[in-house]
Regions:
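Catalytic machinery of carbohydrate-active enzymes
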Residues: 1-353
Length: 353
């Protein structure tokens, strides 16, 4: 009988989006590869996020999925080519960590010897899997829930490693392109997809002078996409000499490197926050309508700021109250400053929840 290290399994992981969800699923990849180093693993992912995984040493390939083309007849030929490719691969395991109709259909079309999904399938995806893994409890963190598929496959869950591998060439490129050296960096992430998860930009701007006055050697890098440029401009005006507005200016891998080289991130509940947790970069996370015990920065939950209001967590994209977003608006820059200082202090161990 072959030892686990000699077993050659061909595996497809389906987790196309979002950034935070993909990052939280990476320990599944790492542990499979550690336990079965001869395995051949592919990851099915939205094209916008593919650069995060392309070149990953644990992957045999990245399968790009154009979500916007899913229902467009003019792209059906391309979709069928993807389907034929899936059928030809003869996967041993198909692991769907997305559990939506699209991913469920592709899990079924892949025709693996064993297909696995999670116990919260939406859009009727439940029928596409041979085995469904239940969430251990209502408050089980997403990372631990994803990892719970591994015992079904005979893969032990014991780990302590960085989820995102170092990219020395890219890191050197970032240092050449931006004035990284000669300063210590705090990264700020003001944007989110949900307006209800966004700490007010004025509060971020008010935080900058507090941190600047107490930390003379630090500068501030403001992260975000093109849509976050207005937020970056407001925050950068708080201290133009020490703020570097990078909103809309970085590729996804470059953003990862900026978070890697920084000593602290202050962030809303959004994808880059999970990148920081994956890299081990200290985080102060600002939560309103969502549940940090399920989706907070993994292994850094003591450093989440969330108010104890009757409506929290509501899990709504829009606030139903007359004073909208009070759950985040009532978090003061002074409170975030105090939490940040504890994270920056060499002997800090206390957090705030």
């Amino acid at each position: 009988m072959r030892s686990p290290a000699q077993r050659l399994e061909k595996i497809l992981i389906l987790k196309p989006s979002s950034l935070g969800d993909v990052v939280q699923a990476l320990p599944v990849l790492r542990l499979i590869k550690r336990h079965l180093p001869a395995s051949e693993i592919y990851w099915w992912i939205d094209s916008n996020l593919a650069p995060l995984l392309e070149g990953d040493p644990d992957l045999a390939g990245v399968v790009r999925f154009e979500r916007r083309r899913w229902a467009a007849p003019c792209h059906w030929d391309e979709i069928w080519r993807s389907v034929r490719w899936l059928r030809q691969q003869a996967f041993d395991w198909v692991i769907d960590l997305q559990c939506l109709m699209r991913s469920g259909v592709f899990a079924w079309l892949a025709n693996g010897k064993l297909s696995i999904g999670l116990d919260e399938p939406r859009e009727g995806a439940r029928g596409f899997y041979d085995h469904i893994v239940r969430r251990p409890s209502a408050l089980t963190h997403a990372v631990d829930w994803y990892l719970s598929v591994l015992p079904v496959l005979g893969v032990p869950v014991n780990w302590d490693f960085q989820w995102l591998p170092e990219r020395p060439v890219l890191a050197a490129s970032v240092r050449r392109q931006w004035p990284v050296d000669g300063a210590r960096w705090i990264v700020l992430q003001p944007g989110t997809r949900w307006a209800s998860k966004r700490w007010p930009v004025e509060a971020f701007a008010g935080l900058v002078p507090l941190l600047a006055s107490a930390n003379s050697g630090f500068r501030f890098a403001i992260l975000g996409g093109e849509e976050d440029r207005p937020l970056g401009e407001v925050i950068a005006r708080a201290d133009p000499a020490r703020c570097l507005d990078l909103t809309g200016r970085l590729s996804l891998p470059e953003m990862v490197e900026w978070i890697r080289l920084s000593e602290l991130m202050v962030s809303n509940d959004t994808g880059p926050m999970h990148v920081a947790a994956a890299l081990g970069t200290p985080v102060v996370a600002l939560f309103g309508p969502t549940e940090p015990r399920r989706t907070g920065p993994y292994r850094q939950l003591d450093h989440v700021l969330q108010l104890n209001l009757p409506c929290v967590p509501c899990l709504h994209r829009r606030c139903a109250y007359s004073k909208p977003f009070e759950c985040l608006r009532a978090i003061t820059p002074a409170a975030v400053f105090e939490a940040a200082q504890r994270r920056l202090a060499p002997t800090a161990s206390a957090g705030l929840r």
